[in-house]
């Protein structure tokens, strides 16, 4: 049974390391490619009001701003938000930047958004289900929630492949202290049940359904273009979606 952490984890002290680790190589490129491909399929061809909850360094927001959408980035960690501001300035794009945790967003946002992004946030929260009603209020009735989260199933599978059987017996999956392993990996079935009161899941994809399981020497030899092509081609395959290190669910709010 998962023991909840005492507080949400913010990235003030880890911003630079986090950025380099996630976005410095193939892992980050695959993540962005899958999220962007999924969103391209559903978003209407008009400017949208977008809220990025836990926006981090703003990679996804910048992509959306570049497509003409009106973007608000909400991020509690000042170094991350500063990095996002610099990224937008370098690109010559405008956005609204809000330094606030998710608990304060309803008080700071006057009306709901056409698209709410919540990517790699839930797994760092002390009580992940608590954010769901807030996300529902922030999403317009005909809008979309783009929810990406760290998949507990994939973490278990990776530990099986590595022979970490003692860790599996103790169910010690969470990262601790300064670890960049999330403190609360999510069980997709449990989350689906919690989500049901607030959203219906319309589309599901796996993010990195095979890359992270490749032997290191094969990862090093593979061309990024080939990795992206194959990850995109297999992200919704029924045998592979659930192996994604992250799962991306596109959701509509329940009435």
What would you call each of these model-derived segments?
Residues 203-255:
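A C-terminal cap/extension of S-adenosyl-L-methionine-dependent methyltransferases
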Residues 120-121:
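Short catalytic micro-motifs in class I SAM-dependent methyltransferases
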Residues 129-144:
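A short glycine-rich, Lys/Arg-flanked "PGG" loop and its adjoining helix->strand segment in the class I
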Residues 51, 59-104:
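Class I SAM-dependent methyltransferase SAM/SAH-binding core
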């Amino acid at each position: 049974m998962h023991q909840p952490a005492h507080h949400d984890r913010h990235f003030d002290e880890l911003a630079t390391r986090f950025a380099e680790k996630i976005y410095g190589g193939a892992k980050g490129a695959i993540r962005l490619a899958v999220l962007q491909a999924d969103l391209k399929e559903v978003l209407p061809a008009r400017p949208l009001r977008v809220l990025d909850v836990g926006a981090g360094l703003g990679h996804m927001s910048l992509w959306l701003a570049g497509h003409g959408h009106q973007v608000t980035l909400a991020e509690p960690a000042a170094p991350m938000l500063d990095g996002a501001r610099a990224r937008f300035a370098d690109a010559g794009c405008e956005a609204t930047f809000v330094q606030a945790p998710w608990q304060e967003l309803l008080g700071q946002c006057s009306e709901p958004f056409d698209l709410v992004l919540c990517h790699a946030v839930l797994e760092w929260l002390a009580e992940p289900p608590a954010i769901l009603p807030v996300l529902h209020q922030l999403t317009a009735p005909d809008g979309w929630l783009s929810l990406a989260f760290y998949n507990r199933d994939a973490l278990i599978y990776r530990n099986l492949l590595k022979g970490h059987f003692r860790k599996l017996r103790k169910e010690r999956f969470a990262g601790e202290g300064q670890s960049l392993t999330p403190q609360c990996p999510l069980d997709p079935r449990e989350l689906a049940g919690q989500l049901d009161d607030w959203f219906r899941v319309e589309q599901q994809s796996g993010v990195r359904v095979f890359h992270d399981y490749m032997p290191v020497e094969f990862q090093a030899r593979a061309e990024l273009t080939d990795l992206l092509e194959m990850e995109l081609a297999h992200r919704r395959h029924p045998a592979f979606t659930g192996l994604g290190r992250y799962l991306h669910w596109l959701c509509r709010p329940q009435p």
